[in-house]
Amino acid sequence: MAALLLAATVARAQYYSWGADAASLRWRTIRTPDVQVIFPDTAGAIARRTLHFIEAARPSIGYGFRHGPLKIPFVMHPENFRSNGLVMWLPKRVEFLTSPAIDSYSMPWYKQLVAHEYRHAVQYNNLNRGVIKGLSYVLGQQGSTVGLLLLPIWLIEGDAVQMETQMSSFGRALQPSFTMEYRALGDAVRSRRNIDRWFCGSYRTNVPDHYHLGYQIAAYADTRYRENIWDKVAWYGARNPYMIFTTSIALKKFYRTDVGTLFAETFDGLNYYWNALPARRNSSRYLSAEPVESYTTYAFPLAVDAQRVLALKTDYDRPTRFVTIDTESGRERAVAYTGSVSTRPAYADGRVWWTEYRRSTLFEQRVNSQLCYMDLDRGKPKAVRGRRHALYPTPTDRGLAWVEYSPDGRFAVTGEAGVQHWEAPAQTELHGLAWDDRTARLYFLATDDSGMWLGRIEPDGTATHLTEGAYITLSDLTARDGRLYFGSIASGYDEVHCYDLATGRQYRLSTSTSGSFSPSADGEGNVLMTTYDAEGYHAARQPIDTLRPVRPSRLPRNVVNPPRRKWPVANLDTVRFTAADSVSSAARHRARRYSRPLHLFKVHSWMPVAVNPFKIIDEHDIDVQLGVTLVSQNLLSSAESYLAYAWNHAEGSVVKGSLRYNGLGIELEVAGTYGGNQVIYAAGQAQPQPIPDKYYSLSAGATLPLVFAAGYRTRMLSLTAAWNFSNGLVANVGKLTYDEATHSFTNLQHIGYREGLHKLTFGIGYSNSVQLAHRDFITPRGYVLSASYALNPTNDHFSDLISVYGKLYTPGFAPHNSLTAAATYQTSIGGFKNPAGESFLSYKSARLIPRGFDSNDINSRNYFAASLDYQLPVWYPEGGIPSVLYFKRIRLNLGADYGQFDAFDYRKGRTETRRIHSFGGDLYVDFNVFRQPASATSTLRLSFYAPSKGGLWWSASLGLPF
């Protein structure tokens, strides 16, 4: 089963679409002998800078592997605040979300992206060899995707993190927070015989992700064997993919080890190193007295008054929300749920300000950072209209200030009328903003080529350095009473620091066992913070009574990281992009217009069988026939298409194709089929059927999906219209004559047929749902409503179909239980009907048919159906067959269905209501195969229902994470 699942996973994952950018963007491209950069004209400076870093990294980015990076295009997406990067086949490209990450370290974002994502291009090139390369000639790029199964995902990401770390002065994996979760867990990581939890994740407790795990194993192995052992693993796998377990075989063959041994040696060594460090005790005291029932994260505690602290709280059972904590009793009060918070909240005069990630109404790749506020006494979050690019809202004595980010890569401090405006220099990122009441100035946290530093905005609109740039990560800037408060890793741990604005001195305030974050002064001589342990991040407080001076340094102390082998690669921290470099780049590599119409098609794959890739994605239906298929997707992810030729004995030759385009916000689709047997719609079995001709059909459709993101709640409205034509033969039922005496049609054999069948469909759908918690599998509250109307505009004898549907989601009787109820109604209107009132020519909706029945068991005459389901988790086994199959969660659904419709009983000579029903259950098994990470969790569903007609009905289906 595991092998079949992986094959199905690849089949679906290879047709992944990143989502379209806004239609208003105008695209350009720069080509070099090694790469192509595709970018909107608004991001021209970002593209030039990124290209410069690519060229600087290229000579050493392949270190440890025998082959360098693929020649691959880089596609820039500048309007998405959810910073990320991705390397894909089908077609091959590197996707860059260029907005700098909010929570970042001391290397500029574009350098981080280049070091990490370009390393993936190296891995892919080393996997695309041998037999895998041969598959690419047979199957196109989808053949190359098979190679991705030959290195585990945790290693692919871990090796990329390792390169990102090696190409910086004090990079990602050296940050104390990168090992903090493992340090807090301690020996618990080695306490389980089955180690798959640490690869596959958990619904019961926190497990660091595969980036953290992969780096630790990769870095240990690199130091232990004095070489990149994954080069030989990739080399062996690409030439022997039929062995399936190629990683295990190669590790045994070349290094006499295996993944389990590497895991054990890695964490035995790490725990030995960490246990030898001097013991540290938290200097802060936890504020909340609430019991910790699951892994919990408090963030950004702020003093409301002397008795209350406001904080964001998230746990495995509930999504993010504001809570107040009584500082005396430790009791909590929930205030309001929020959406996905992008930057820290600020509080002043009874009002809370913060920002949230919110998708635009039309375009998937336009994700904004929306300015929000809430009056604390009312507890109702609201959005500030028009403020969609805001970061770090900060109340001042002249109004609200915030950081504004533009898609061209520039940051600025701006705000309400009267607030000093300052535009940051090019190539300078802003990662914090604070207002100090004593000095009446705005202060900021910046990152540039020199590292991270603190600055002040002067009354004349200029900026002053308070500290020099250093490769020391700073975070969570706040200010009060003449001091700046922030997180710093200068000591080798994540600790709370302050900067005295009067003396220009920096001090460390906290001492932590694992780490402390998000400081803010409470005005009562204390500093609030969050402090980490194995149960999560806790809201905490300590007096400001111990100031430990911090000496300026270019690098932090390296305390928690054991020695690892240093690679001879470029340090991107030393690479600068100057005005002269920009001029030189423009002279060597001219930017040209990138025409979207001319690049609508990019055939990346083919196969010697006929399949419909859209059905693979939409319906999980893999129908393979003899033939050939071409698959296309453009580099902007706005157009997908396929063309297939199939042959089968029953229909002969059939050609099918379809094109989907979503670059305008409206999703457009056209499709066509030619070949096979003409469809015949007879008025009855007694009507003679002619010899069918070749079948053909054309269809076109448009969907307008509108997303109304409102924080905790998301609403969606979808409007659809579709037209379909086929050359089907339709009985001329208007010519029928009926004999009342014999209750029969007298001329059925002579009415003939009419060629051509049109279908026009209109639909509207609306949904309203809330965010899910980590352990939720269905939205706990929400509903779905839809209605559709189908008609044949050219044949009055066809009945129209009207259909409505509704579904309600509610919580069950225990946490993470779900009770859902659904109902539908459909009926045929107009058209030709026999004396019994039944339509010969009508449409039918297959939505909500009692389980155990199908559409042949109902008709559309006053059809009503309802269903009731109750789903709950029953077990979190977290075990299985080590390294092969990991069972993460088992769920049970109990369901009952009911349906009824009108049908004419010819024996009784009257119309009756026929009723059907079924009841039973579904068993859901959430699992991972071959130590795939949490993001690759799949679901097996086994359904068993007893319908009112027939025997026991059962089915099995597989839900994939793509």
Provide a role label for each language-model segment.
Residues 762, 866, 920-921, 951-962:
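Outer-membrane beta-barrel "beta-signal"
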Residues 488, 546-665, 669-670, 749-780, ...:
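Outer-membrane beta-barrel initiation region
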Residues 18-29, 205, 232-350:
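Beta/coil-rich, acidic/histidine-enriched accessory regions frequently appended to metallopeptidases
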Residues 677, 688, 735-892, 902-904, ...:
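C-terminal outer-membrane beta-barrel translocator/porin domains of Gram-negative envelope proteins
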Residues 22, 108-113, 121, 126-219, ...:
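Acidic/His/Gly-enriched intrinsically disordered linker/tail segments
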Residues 173, 313-322, 337-342, 355-370, ...:
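A flexible loop/linker signature enriched in serine peptidases of the S9 family
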Residues 13-146, 246:
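Juxtacatalytic substrate-recognition/specificity segment
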